[in-house]
Curated annotation (Swiss-Prot):
Keywords: Acyltransferase, Lipid A biosynthesis, Lipid biosynthesis, Lipid metabolism, Repeat, Transferase. The active site is at H248 (proton acceptor). This is UDP-3-O-acylglucosamine N-acyltransferase. Belongs to the transferase hexapeptide repeat family. LpxD subfamily. It comes from the Bacteria.
Length: 347
């Protein structure tokens, strides 16, 4: 694709194209990071990006930059093809969709698929090899079910969903529109519910539902448990990374982002736009307000207020955590000084 064609596409996008220079209008085959890009590749820079200095000697064919004078001057001096955009990262995402259009599997049901009784399959769907669909389940129109997926009984999958190889939807799972479930993820698995008795643990039946609202994406190997009663609900547009555990009865607001190895215990509540970085742990019935952020390895108990940024275990306001962190390495010397003061102080 010529850079000029890409510019025409970006003009229709939402990244805010402001200006561009075609230079020699290079033919672009793919995208790459600026430090590795070749003459037939596209890259981008954001304000404050650590790779900014690479622009002076990168071999990139064309680059997407923010409205930043120093970057524009470098691009012009080097004769690079470039575009100035309000949001270069978003533009790069839109460009990659043009450079790497995804192929859709052919519609139809593979002969090795096992389809239960009273299953409804919408128009234009693609069912891959060795898929199993349980009795009474419904798969919406234009959905893609890749090989090896197992869909239990009484599952509802809305329109235009994509279930990648070996994903599992257990009984009572409900998916809205345009959801993506990646390989080896399990939606609707039984919650960790047991009742202590004199004879050991008695299993609590997990009869509830798991609901993924529209546009939810679930990463590889992640699990979302169903509760004993009621539902576990993942808000629209929420993105879940690989290897995330979401316990029974958890409810998230819209547009949350949960990074790898996050663990959320049963009954926790997340507001809209919450961001949990890698390995964050959320305790049973904790409440996290809208647009709160937890940095990596934070341990959240109780309540986090809306818009707050927390760190550490137990999680405390980020600024306080940074101050505490700065003292950790000094603790041995401080303890030594304290012992000396104690010895030298008259009793």
């Amino acid at each position: 694709m010529r850079f000029s064609q890409l510019i025409a596409s970006l003009q229709q996008g939402s990244a805010g194209l402001q200006d561009h220079q075609l230079a020699e209008d290079p033919e672009l085959l793919s995208g790459a990071s600026l430090d590795q890009a070749k003459a037939n590749q596209l890259s981008f820079l954001e304000q404050g990006n650590a790779l900014t200095t690479q622009l002076s000697h990168s071999k990139v064919g064309a680059v997407l930059i923010p409205p930043q004078d120093d970057l524009r001057v470098i691009a012009e001096q080097r004769g690079l093809a470039f575009a100035v955009l309000r949001d270069p990262r978003l533009a790069f995402a839109e460009a990659l969709e043009q450079l790497h259009p995804r192929s859709r599997p052919k519609a139809g049901v593979h002969p090795t698929a096992v389809i239960g009784d009273q299953v409804h399959l919408g128009q234009g769907i693609s069912i891959g090899a060795h898929v199993v669909i349980g009795d009474g389940s419904r798969i919406g129109a234009y959905s893609v079910v890749h090989p090896g997926v197992v869909i239990y009984e009484d599952v509802v999958v809305g329109e235009a969903n994509e279930l990648h190889a070996n994903a599992v939807l257990q009984p009572g799972s409900r998916l809205g529109l345009n959801c993506v479930v990646h390989s080896n993820a399990v939606v609707g698995s039984e919650g960790f519910g047991f009742v202590p008795t004199a004879n050991g643990w008695r299993k609590m039946p997990q009869t509830g539902l798991v609901v993924l609202e529209d546009g939810v994406e679930v990463g590889c190997g992640s699990t979302i448990d169903r509760p004993s009663v009621g539902e576990t609900r993942i808000g629209a547009g929420t993105k879940i990374d690989n290897l995330v555990q979401i316990g029974h009865g958890v409810v998230t607001g819209q547009g949350c982002a949960l990074a790898s190895q996050v663990g959320i215990a049963g009954g926790a509540r997340l507001g809209e736009g919450v961001i949990l970085a890698g390995q964050v742990g959320v305790a049973n019935r904790a409440v996290i307000g809208d647009r709160a952020i937890a940095s990596s390895k934070s341990g959240i108990h109780g309540e986090v207020e809306a818009g707050e940024v927390v760190s550490g275990y137990p999680a405390i306001p980020n600024r306080l955590w940074l101050r505490c962190s700065a003292t950790f390495s000094k603790l041995p010397e401080m303890a030594k000084m304290l012992r000396k003061l104690t010895r030298d102080t008259p009793q």
